[in-house]
From Swiss-Prot:
GO cellular component terms, semicolon-separated: membrane
Keywords noted in UniProt: Glycoprotein, Membrane, Signal, Transmembrane, Transmembrane helix
Keyword Plastid part of the UniProt annotation: no
Name of protein: 5'-adenylylsulfate reductase-like 4
Gene3D superfamilies documented for this protein: Glutaredoxin
Glycosylated residues in this chain: 147
Species, as recorded: Oryza sativa subsp. japonica (Rice)
Membrane topology listed for this record: Single-pass membrane protein
Domain of life: Eukaryota
Amino acid sequence: MAAATASASASASAAAFLLLPLLAAAATAGHGVCPRQPAAAAVLPRQSSCPAAGSPGHRAHHVGVVEGDDFVLQKAVTLVLQNREDFVAILFYASWCPFSKIFRTDFQKLSSFFPTIAHFSFEESRIKPRMLSRYGVRAFPTLFLVNSTMRVRYHGSRTMNSLAMFYKDVTGMNPVSLDAISLERMEEVVNIIENDKKTEQGDSLFMFARSPDRLLHQDTCLALASSFVLMRLLCFLLPKLNACVKQAWRMQFYELKRLLSNLS
């Protein structure tokens, strides 16, 4: 009986000795392996969210502004539902609106000042009207800060100080200090937006000849104003043109009558 007990104890000790490397590997796996990224990471470009061993958890930093359509808007809603404490900034703008062009530049700067907030922007023509109605968008630009419990719309002035205070009041976060790399990246984005503005201004003279349907859809006010000016011009010119035509026919009629009288 004692021999059997000793044999069982020896077998248990050998098994424990063989399992020690596996247990050690399992203990270190939580620190040395990065977790699998969620599906939203395919839409939101992030920096590495795998912390070093012994470091506390921190919020992921989102790089830049994600431009998208209805599908990306749905991804933003999914991100809010997955991270209930995190905020998402959503900007609705219109390419024909000059205020939207200025606001886009400030929105890009805000994404650098508040990197822990995911920033999404949506152009009017890429979003279905029912989605704009769902969010109550009646003018451009329109900015929201959204999380799982609230949706706050910005109503203040379009200055950076006012926007930063709005972010701080709603989220409780302070703007971060930017390093040289972040400033350089932000400057590059601002230059790209400025170049786009110059290109749009250069092409605006040929917009009507190139695509009048697009002009009517995106620049409705400009199209109506142009139509009004043309109608007023026609109302001014048509009476004078009619009088000139009548005078020409009258002169031709008198000339023909004189020729007939000479022949007779």
